[in-house]
A protein has these predicted regions:
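Catalytic-core regions built around general acid/base machinery
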Residues: 24-37, 90, 94
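A general structural motif
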Residues: 1-3, 37, 99
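Structural recognition of alpha->loop->beta junctions
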Residues: 56-74
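Asp-based phosphoryl-transfer active-site loop
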Residues: 2-19
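Glycine-rich loop at the start of a catalytic domain that most often binds anionic cofactors/ligands
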Residues: 52-60, 116-120
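Substrate-recognition element of Asp-dependent hydrolases with the DxDx(T/V) motif
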Residues: 30-52, 67, 102-109
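Charged helix-capping and loop-helix junction motifs
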Residues: 22-25, 84-85
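HAD-like small-molecule phosphatases
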Residues: 69-123
């Protein structure tokens, strides 16, 4: 059989809603794909550090995260690019000026910086 490559989103695809809980049927399907020698990976807009938590829990070693800006293969980060700082600052200024809640992750950590005390309740 020819090796196939399967990429799965987390939120609402592998997991139930925005949780990190995966149905047993999805876990079984992933196990069968891996046993058959196929490549499995997570592809998500989530921060790599957040995706890695899910990946570790469910046996993924390959991750495309940060909306495609980072690539992890066999558990090693091969590529990670951040958005240009000046553009991010301009965008945050625009969000503030328009009263739109925002949060940023300046590092690859499950930590956000925000000026909005209610941000987590909005997410």
């Amino acid at each position: 059989m020819r090796k196939k490559y399967f990429f799965f989103d987390i939120d609402g695809t592998l997991s139930t809603g925005l949780t990190t809980t995966m149905p047993e049927s999805a876990v079984k399907c992933l196990d069968l794909l891996r046993q058959a020698g196929h490549f499995t990976a997570i592809a998500t807009g989530r921060l790599q550090a957040s995706a890695k938590t899910v990946a570790d829990r469910y046996g993924f070693t390959n991750i495309v995260a940060d909306g495609g800006w980072s690539v992890t293969i066999d558990g090693k980060i091969l590529e990670m690019q951040s958005l240009p700082a000046a553009e991010c600052i301009r965008f945050v200024d625009w969000l503030r000026g328009n009263g739109i809640p925002w949060a940023i992750s300046p590092e690859n950590e499950k930590l956000c910086v925000t000026s909005d005390r209610n941000y987590l309740s909005l997410a």
